[in-house]
Amino acid sequence: MSKTRRMVLIAMLAALSTILLLPILQFPLLPGIDFMKVELSIIPVLIGVFTLGLGDGFIILFIRSVLWYLLFNQGPSTWIGVPMNFVALGIFMAIVWFFTKKKFSIKNYTVGIVLATIASVLVMMVLNVFYALPLYRLAAGFDVDKIFAGATHLFNMGSLSVTLNPTYLLTVVLPFNALQYIIFALVFGLIVTVFKKNKVVKFYNA
């Protein structure tokens, strides 16, 4: 693939990924938890990973994240949430790619998806405790500890208060993210199957 064609494909996938961030295309998963919604912007990024390579996939993810800041900035929810999203999705796609880069089979894809989902969910839980929730509490006045009982204060980091809330983590963060990554896996798996069958695009070792 020529350098020009590669750059055009990166730009197109980044643009498509950004379009999928439109609020109208997002949807909640858990009843009563409207502040956490699924967006499918990772799908074009995964297509980039498996057609161009992991490095270009991260470039697409980075461009999408920058455009998210510029086009859909909603204050603290954006500047706190986007870095978390970048880290978790980066881990997810890197693990899936690692297990399928030699051969894209159902077995390898399933193993990759399961391990990637577990890793990404754990990372999101840790980031919620030590990064997101303290910042939301300070910058936006949003304190989940007032909604979900059972929080334990851990320590202070300057003006940030770090707490551990097992109720919120186990009933919201864990199921939401697990379901979200399962949706990503099913949608991308379907796309790979359709693209392979119709020879729309060549995936790595697929």
UniProtKB/Swiss-Prot annotation:
Protein known as: Riboflavin transporter RibU
Miscellaneous remark of the record: Riboflavin, FMN and roseoflavin, but not FAD, bind to RibU with high affinity and 1:1 stoichiometry.
Protein family per UniProt: Belongs to the prokaryotic riboflavin transporter (P-RFT) (TC 2.A.87) family.
Name of the coding gene: ribU
Bilayer disposition of the protein: Multi-pass membrane protein
Effect of residue 79 to Y: No change in riboflavin binding
Compartments, as annotated in UniProt: Cell membrane
Disulfide bonds: none
InterPro entries tied to this protein: ECF_trnsprt_substrate-spec, RibU
A Pfam family recorded for this sequence: ECF_trnsprt
Subunit structure: Forms a stable energy-coupling factor (ECF) transporter complex composed of a membrane-embedded substrate-binding protein (S component), 2 ATP-binding proteins (A component) and 2 transmembrane proteins (T component). May be able to interact with more than 1 S component at a time.
Activity control note: Inhibited by FMN and roseoflavin.
